[in-house]
Amino acid sequence: MYACSKFVSTRSLIRSTSQLLSRPLSAVELKRPQMPTDEGLSCLAVRRPLTSLIPSRSFQTSAISRDIDTAAKFIGAGAATVGVAGSGAGIGTVFGSLIIGYARNPSLKQQLFSYAILGFALSEAMGLFCLMVAFLILFAM
């Protein structure tokens, strides 16, 4: 009983366990197991690595993992598509401001119209950029 309690409460076991759990997953998978070096463990006949006492975490390549990746892809594409609605709101704001400006000062008709076309082009370009990002997320990743 004394040997078992000494084995469980060994400082090196606690230290290596906490180091193992605090390391990233790739380091846990790729690092070779360490052999115990404490003198208190020498009374045990079977020597096993300290990392074998903790269940090994493995990379997830299951169907659930792929479903999560697909859902994240759709969520990202949907969030990028929201920018297209912002483009529509921008175009409406540009032409609404054109009408208000023309009503206030009809003599600036040509200058206001050229600025409205510039605002329309910039807003439409941002909308197309958002749509392109959405398609890249869906089909290129």
Swiss-Prot record:
Modified-residue entries (N6,N6,N6-trimethyllysine), positions: K109
InterPro entries with a match to the protein in the record: ATP_synth_F0_csu, ATP_synth_F0_csu_DDCD_BS, ATP_synth_F0_csu_sf, ATPase_proteolipid_c-like_dom, F/V-ATP_Csub_sf
GO biological process: pore complex assembly; proton motive force-driven ATP synthesis; response to 3,3',5-triiodo-L-thyronine; response to ethanol
Swiss-Prot/TrEMBL site (Reversibly protonated during proton transport) positions: E124
Transmembrane segments: 82-102, 117-137
Post-translational modification: Trimethylated by ATPSCKMT at Lys-109. Methylation is required for proper incorporation of the C subunit into the ATP synthase complex and mitochondrial respiration.
Transit peptide extent on chain: 1-66
Alphabetized Pfam families for the sequence: ATP-synt_C
HAMAP family xrefs: ATP_synth_c_bact (MF_01396)
Quaternary structure annotation from Swiss-Prot or TrEMBL: F-type ATPases have 2 components, CF(1) - the catalytic core - and CF(0) - the membrane proton channel. CF(1) has five subunits: alpha(3), beta(3), gamma(1), delta(1), epsilon(1). CF(0) has three main subunits: a, b and c. Interacts with DNAJC30; interaction is direct.
Similarity comment: Belongs to the ATPase C chain family.
Involvement in disease: This protein is the major protein stored in the storage bodies of animals or humans affected with ceroid lipofuscinosis (Batten disease).
PANTHER family (alphabetical): ATP SYNTHASE F(0) COMPLEX SUBUNIT C3, MITOCHONDRIAL, ATP SYNTHASE LIPID-BINDING PROTEIN, MITOCHONDRIAL
Protein name: ATP synthase F(0) complex subunit C2, mitochondrial
Taxonomic placement: Eukaryota, Metazoa, Chordata, Craniata, Vertebrata
